[in-house]
């Protein structure tokens, strides 16, 4: 059957929902990888309760205690005589199967560099695909800061596994709302555009740090969105438009109602937008006076055009400099 993976399954809530939303009792392999022992145990317990309440079903369940991003998950030899090594080897076997669907809510943190030592050399090598071209890279470049954010690494890991599969496949992940349009993620969006066939975008929570009141489903100040990408095997990949519906402005009850609708009702609410070649954003731009905007100089420019500052240095925005950088 098909193989479905949550590469950062936590306590198993996404895996539980896959089972509960499968009325036809499909014969698929359901796999979850989790690095922390406590969530790993809770996810196993959670799925055992689901099986007890709803029957074992035709699917198989495998929750493994493994670091999804380590080299062992890409086929590097591990010491299987240890519990950790045996779990990684087992997880790697499942991850190398033809995957149909990857779902999850990957961890997100830009406050520290993670997974950067030699044990993670494979995923770090793959992250080059999310960087700017070498010709425009510079030291201390802010747009490269997010490369070591775990959620970015999980996106790239998921892409690598799905693109190897010789079948149609789907990637559905929760991402920070800023991923949809921030310049820091421009080249990650470009990679997705070039390697998948279609995308659906659903903002769920607004970014509360901007001062906008938001009734958030996710317990974080940072906004959240869901991206759903499909890949048609055997066809040339690539898309230049996206399907978009915004649920971020409703109350929690309204959001839950939206998300629990029949899929045919939800699909009808999406609108199609062309992707702006200058930003590669997955978020519609708000209307503005373009002629007036073009009268002004940018803060800086990399193409020797008129700009307020000829040189710039990345740094922390403090109160005295907020006037120039906000």
Feature roles, as predicted:
Residues 1-201:
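SAM-dependent methyltransferase catalytic region
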Residues 97, 114-116, 141, 160-326:
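Sequence-level detector for compositionally biased, low-complexity segments
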